[in-house]
């Protein structure tokens, strides 16, 4: 087949270009073989590999250089794609019998040799522990630490097997409880045995360190050299079997306990007397043992875990608190079915004087231990260590072999299992609370008691970082049982102990004796007749417990011994009150307090937690053991109590007392009382409603006083900023005239307000007195407010020059300006003077009428309003005069008019359409009427209609208001949105002018052409008339205080505009006719009234005289001294109002007559 030469040459060119990929367009380099391939191909021509971007997730082949997968929309950026080296193969799963998450990780599997060494170490530790238990009965703390060391090693190897750890703890606890009972009762102490135990402890520590090295070696094993998991199981099985064997031995010991045998008081008392006599020697030896135990704990227990110790009730209370802190034992008498709820609260070391409830972190622990364990009577918590107290029946029957195991199991199953609550609270110590009531044993005058309580030689004057030590209650056993029989629920008592870092509170539920009533609780044993020795022992333990807190002590206080004499008790009561005041107050949510009844028994707590409830919502927080004053009949059997209790405070009464104190403090208007409130209450309320009203009013008053102080301070700082940032630097660039025109008397205002603020924060004057005294000085604001508009015009003219503009730009970068310009600062004096009456009125409303500052506030409000009214009227006069001068200069054809007459002032101006060719009798179409647009100027006695040409006005006509009448026209000739009114001259041949409203609105002359200033509040919706201090009897229509910006009245609709003009002209006409009928004498006399009264006392054109009467009533009723001249003025005003009503009816009848 012949091929055309042109086609052959074209194909050769194409082939050459495909080979020379770098010189071709639309070619991409293959990532595999790095050869060029056209982009149109999906595979490489050389190696057939993919050219496009393949998704690393769904393996979809996308376009070249695409950023996202078309199918799964995943990002295809190279940085987001994981490298191949980072993806490791999935390890092969090997089934093993032990469900341990740690053993699956092969990096920590020990070798066979290491397992054998661990077993040998464990056997050695167990042998050492057995030797220590046999040789030393008094040093149970060393044995306990050795056992804990072994347990820590076991738990580190089999960390996941939680049940085995629990069983191990249970087994060790049984040995500990036996050792405790023997140590407490025993009389001998062998120092040689202590040394042997210390050596054993050191040996055990060495073994433990060797076991710890196993973990370091195991974590550094290579992943490639793995041994089978079955090889690591054998040491664990041996450990578990060893634990189970020890558990069986302990169960035999527990089964040997006798059944509910009645407690023999003689045995327990003999044991206690033995301990009492040897307490001094035991304390010395225990101190040596505690040092050794502390070293063992530091070496082995890296992560502190609170454990449980077991001890008897009476000796555990007598023991040194240092020993209790360092014992870490695990009880064996916790039942399987018990649900233990733990609330952890973490205490912070803080020296602030208030108590704050911390956050709670709650969880629940179910202790799965042996069901045949003995019952728990009470718990004592110390630094996270729980000490269980065994009943006296259990203590007395340890050596008795006559028992029935079935009966024991049945009795234990019938008893309700208590619930244990552990809480560690985040507290801020110490709260400043009111002094608690005096303890009864200090106030009671017991003549028959001969007991002397010897307190410690040095106690703390203020305890900042600690809470009270565990208290001991001692009472008659028989009286206790009699009272407990009458209780409806099982009582509970708690003993709270804390250190500087942890606060632990526990609630202990005491189990009843099976042979007595369930309500009878065995908690306190009879004391020996020799009370002096037992109390001395208690005082020694208390002294040791307080000495353990030396790290947080700052001051010490010596207390003399408390005897039966009343004088010594009273002398020491104040010292004890100082100690009690330093303790934190009880929690506000659950103020459950165990109290002693009059017969000496322990009162049951009605709010104790329910054992069947698994949650810990109803946790009983027994704060302290309280004192009870015995009756005269029981003085012989009364036994004193030694305790450092938490203050027992009724929080509801305390809150009410604080509220009453606050109400009393807020009743005083002194500023110093607001900042530093007094602690004494001067007023009390009889009912809850009155108390609530006083508190609400006092809170509002306090907020208002704070607002006045803070805003005044900010205002003084702003005035100082104007002077230092703007005024003084500009004096170098501008003349003195320009500086006075811009800043006016700003420095004088700053001096006055600075003195005002100093008087407000003083301790001698009240708010009303300060403003009443400083009211005359505030008149300087009149000059500033009158020339404020001129100040803004001068500033705008100054900013037009480039040099000054750059200077102001540099000033705006200063931080004290807060991003505001000079205009924002110059308006602040105008705003502040108008805010004073508003703040004082609100403060007057929030002040009680019987308050001593109430009449002063009324007087201050009256004076400030009068000053503000004067400033407002003067400003209106100034603006009216300035506008009138502009009109005279720009008005043509009004040479004969005297617009600057003394009794004449401008009120309104705006646009109107003059209707030409309109008659009321003839109905004509709208097309035949002609409208001529013009501008009107309404004075108080004159109406002008002009035609505007640029900035000038040409007068078309004018008329006196006392010669015309006004009528509202209703005709079909005008649209519905057009309002028409007519002015008709009185008399034969009088002229008539008909006007129609336009789109433009009328405005009050007092705020026309201004950008900021003072405006009357009622003029925002209607252009009402105002008097600038005229003598024609026309007073100000509006209120005297307000703030405006710009021509705010230019947004009214057309109907309101026309109604405003119509109503204003009508009232002005009525006003002029009233002046004619009343005569010039009455007019001149009436004009003198506003000068002696408040600016609000003038009559308004709209007939609203309520402001007049209200202001008059305030001035007459509120002022403490009402003069006879004010009463005469009030009577004259009432006569004038009656005459106005009579004349107004006559004027309206004349105005409504149609010509």
Curated annotation (Swiss-Prot):
One Pfam family cited in the UniProt record for this chain: RhoGEF
Cellular component, GO, one term: cytosol
Residue spans of biased composition, Basic and acidic residues class: 320-330
Name by which UniProt lists this protein: RhoGEF domain-containing protein gxcJ
Signal peptide as annotated in the record: none
Organism ancestry: Eukaryota, Amoebozoa, Evosea, Eumycetozoa, Dictyostelia
GO molecular function, one term: guanyl-nucleotide exchange factor activity
PROSITE patterns in the cross-refs: DH_2
Keyword terms of this UniProt record: Coiled coil, Guanine-nucleotide releasing factor
């Amino acid at each position: 087949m012949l091929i055309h030469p042109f086609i052959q040459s074209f194909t050769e060119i194409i082939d050459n270009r495909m080979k020379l990929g770098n010189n071709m367009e639309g070619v991409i380099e293959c990532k595999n073989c790095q050869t060029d391939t056209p982009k149109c191909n999906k595979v490489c021509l050389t190696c057939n590999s993919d050219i496009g971007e393949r998704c690393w997730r769904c393996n979809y082949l996308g376009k070249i250089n695409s950023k996202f997968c078309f199918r799964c929309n995943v990002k295809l950026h190279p940085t987001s794609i994981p490298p191949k080296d980072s993806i490791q193969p999935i390890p092969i799963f090997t089934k093993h019998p032990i469900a341990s998450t740690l053993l699956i990780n092969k990096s920590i599997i020990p070798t066979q040799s290491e397992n054998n060494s661990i077993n040998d170490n464990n056997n050695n530790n167990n042998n050492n522990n057995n030797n220590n238990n046999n040789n030393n009965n008094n040093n149970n703390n060393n044995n306990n630490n050795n056992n804990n060391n072994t347990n820590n090693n076991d738990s580190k190897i089999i960390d996941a097997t939680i049940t085995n750890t629990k069983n191990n703890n249970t087994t060790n606890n049984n040995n500990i409880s036996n050792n405790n009972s023997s140590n407490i009762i025993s009389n001998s102490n062998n120092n040689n045995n202590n040394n042997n135990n210390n050596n054993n402890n050191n040996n055990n520590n060495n073994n433990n360190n060797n076991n710890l090295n196993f973990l370091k070696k195991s974590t550094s094993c290579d992943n490639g050299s793995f041994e089978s998991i079955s090889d690591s199981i054998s040491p664990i099985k041996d450990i578990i079997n060893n634990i189970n064997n020890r558990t069986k031995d302990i169960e035999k010991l527990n089964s040997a306990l006798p059944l509910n045998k009645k407690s023999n008081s003689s045995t327990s008392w003999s044991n206690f007397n033995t301990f009492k006599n040897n307490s001094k020697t035991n304390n010395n030896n225990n101190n040596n043992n505690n040092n050794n135990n502390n070293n063992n704990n530091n070496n082995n227990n890296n992560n502190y875990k609170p454990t449980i110790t077991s001890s008897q009730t009476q000796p555990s209370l007598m023991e040194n608190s240092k020993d209790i802190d360092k014992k870490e034992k695990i009880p064996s008498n916790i039942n399987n079915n018990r649900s233990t709820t733990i609330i952890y609260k973490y205490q912070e070391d803080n020296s602030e004087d208030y108590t704050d409830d911390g956050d709670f972190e709650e969880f629940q622990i179910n202790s799965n231990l042996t069901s045949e364990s003995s019952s728990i009577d009470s718990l004592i918590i110390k630094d996270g260590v729980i000490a269980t107290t065994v009943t006296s029946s259990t203590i007395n029957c340890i050596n008795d072999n006559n028992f029935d195991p079935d009966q024991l199991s049945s009795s234990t199953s019938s008893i309700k299992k208590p619930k244990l609550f552990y809480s560690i609270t985040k507290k801020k110590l110490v709260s400043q609370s009111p002094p608690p009531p005096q303890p009864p044993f200090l106030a009671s005058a017991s003549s028959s008691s001969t007991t002397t309580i010897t307190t410690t030689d040095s106690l703390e004057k203020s305890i900042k970082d600690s809470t009270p030590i565990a208290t001991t209650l001692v009472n008659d056993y028989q009286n206790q049982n009699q009272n407990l029989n009458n209780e409806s629920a099982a009582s509970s008592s708690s003993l709270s102990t804390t250190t500087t870092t942890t606060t632990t509170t526990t609630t202990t539920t005491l189990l009843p004796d099976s042979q007595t009533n369930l309500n009878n609780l065995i908690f306190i044993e009879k004391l020996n007749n020799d009370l002096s020795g037992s109390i001395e022992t208690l005082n020694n333990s208390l002294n040791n417990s307080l000495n353990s807190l030396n790290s947080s002590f700052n001051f010490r206080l010596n207390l003399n011994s408390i005897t039966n004499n009343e004088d010594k008790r009273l002398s020491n009561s104040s010292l004890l009150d100082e100690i009690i005041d330093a303790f934190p107050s009880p929690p506000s949510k659950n103020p459950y307090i165990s109290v002693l009844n009059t017969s000496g028994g322990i009162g049951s707590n009605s709010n104790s937690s329910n054992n069947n409830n698994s949650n810990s919502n109803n946790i009983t927080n027994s704060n302290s053991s309280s004192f009870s004053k015995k009756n005269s009949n029981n003085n012989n059997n009364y036994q004193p109590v030694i305790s450092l209790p938490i203050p027992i405070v009724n929080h509801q009464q305390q809150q009410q007392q604080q509220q009453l104190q606050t109400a009393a403090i807020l009743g005083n208007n002194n500023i110093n009382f607001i900042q530093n409130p007094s602690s004494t209450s001067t007023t009390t309320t009889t009912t809850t409603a009155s108390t609530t009203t006083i508190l609400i009013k006092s809170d509002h008053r306090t907020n208002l006083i704070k607002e006045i102080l803070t805003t005044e301070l900010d205002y003084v700082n702003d005035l100082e900023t104007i002077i230092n940032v703007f005024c003084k630097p500009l004096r170098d660039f501008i003349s003195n005239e320009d500086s006075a025109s811009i800043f006016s008397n700003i420095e004088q205002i700053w001096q006055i307000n600075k003195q005002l603020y100093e008087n407000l924060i003083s301790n001698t004057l009240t708010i009303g007195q300060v403003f009443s005294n400083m009211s005359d000085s505030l008149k300087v604001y009149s000059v500033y407010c009158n020339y404020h508009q001129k100040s803004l015009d001068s500033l705008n003219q100054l900013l037009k020059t480039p040099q000054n503009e750059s200077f102001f730009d540099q000033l705006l970068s200063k931080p004290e300006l807060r991003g505001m310009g000079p205009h924002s600062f110059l308006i602040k004096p105008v705003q502040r003077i108008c805010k004073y009456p508003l703040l004082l009125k609100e403060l007057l409303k929030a002040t009680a009428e019987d308050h001593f500052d109430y009449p002063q506030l009324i007087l201050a409000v009256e004076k400030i309003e009068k000053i503000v009214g004067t400033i407002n009227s003067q400003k209106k006069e100034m603006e009216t005069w300035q506008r009138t001068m502009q009109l005279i200069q720009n008005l043509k054809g009004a040479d004969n008019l005297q617009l600057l007459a003394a009794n004449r002032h401008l009120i309104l101006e705006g646009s109107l359409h003059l209707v030409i060719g309109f008659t009321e009798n003839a109905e004509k179409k709208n097309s035949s009427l002609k409208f001529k647009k013009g501008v009107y100027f309404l004075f108080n006695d004159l109406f002008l209609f002009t035609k505007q040409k640029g900035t000038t006005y040409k007068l078309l006509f004018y008329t006196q208001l006392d010669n015309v009448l006004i009528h509202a026209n209703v005709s079909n000739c005008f649209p519905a949105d057009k309002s028409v009114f007519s002015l008709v001259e009185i008399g034969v041949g009088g002229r008539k002018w008909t006007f129609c409203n336009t789109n433009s609105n009328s405005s009050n002359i007092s705020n026309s052409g201004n950008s900021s200033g003072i405006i009357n509040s009622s003029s925002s919706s209607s252009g009402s008339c105002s008097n600038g201090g005229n003598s024609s009897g026309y007073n100000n229509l509006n209120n005297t205080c307000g703030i405006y910006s710009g021509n705010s009245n230019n947004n009214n609709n057309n109907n309101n505009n026309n109604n405003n003009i119509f109503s204003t002209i009508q009232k002005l006409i009525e006003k002029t006719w009233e002046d004619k009928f009343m005569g010039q004498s009455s007019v001149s006399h009436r004009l003198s009234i506003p000068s002696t009264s408040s600016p609000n006392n003038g009559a308004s054109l709209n007939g609203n005289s309520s402001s007049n009467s209200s202001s008059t009533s305030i001035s007459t009723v509120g002022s403490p001294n009402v003069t006879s001249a004010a009463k005469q003025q009030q009577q004259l005003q009432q006569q004038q109002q009656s005459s106005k009503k009579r004349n107004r009816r006559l004027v309206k009848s004349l105005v409504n007559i149609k010509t």
